[in-house]
């Protein structure tokens, strides 16, 4: 059963989905995939499953286990997950953490569901979720912007927008595939590409500058996203 107040035209035309129908009396898993500001409203519609053996699996950023236990009861099984958008092409990475009532079987069932769209990792504690959100949850947007910026830089050097974008996209996709398929660390892959006195070294001298390079900038980026995640969790 799928509850969606504003279903898309595509969703309306999928016959296999039971859309906005009466909920069953029992449910093995309830997946919560709504915006954080709408979460409490959504939870009121599924209170019948609270304090039962139903697993509440949330993929909403900033919605804490404490909040779910407050709304659903201390005897509810809560698993919080942070997926990312590459899940839409089965290349996602999802981190999960459960509350004290969560069993190994509950985690395995949730992992089996989430593994359908990529990889799943378990966290040691919920505090890690803010950093996870900043790295893998928001991370795809950083990469997309890198592609944009690389393509714009190519245009500035005289390439056509189409050619520069194709080169940039293929380069990021290829580099990502290489990191996935090789046993070498990204740092070694970087060294493999870098010839002494060559073009890559000239570029890396700027990117790897301790003060104005990419590393300090990325630290600021991840810190900002982590702080925002913590702020959302307190609302």
PLM segments and residue spans:
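Small-residue helix-packing motif on alpha-helices
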Residues: 39, 160-167, 189, 200
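Conserved acidic E/D residue at the C-terminus of a beta-strand in Rossmann-like folds
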Residues: 1-5
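Short pre-catalytic strand/loop immediately N-terminal to key active-site residues, enriched for Gly-Thr
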Residues: 128-134, 186-191
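Rossmann-like NAD(P)(H) cofactor-binding subdomain of soluble oxidoreductases
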Residues: 7-12, 17-96, 100
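NAD(P)-dependent Rossmann-like dehydrogenase/reductase catalytic/cofactor-binding core
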Residues: 169-235
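A general structural signal for well-ordered alpha-helical segments in protein cores
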Residues: 27, 39, 43, 65, ...
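Internal alpha-helical scaffold of NAD(P)-dependent oxidoreductase catalytic cores
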Residues: 67-77, 93-131, 142-181, 226-228
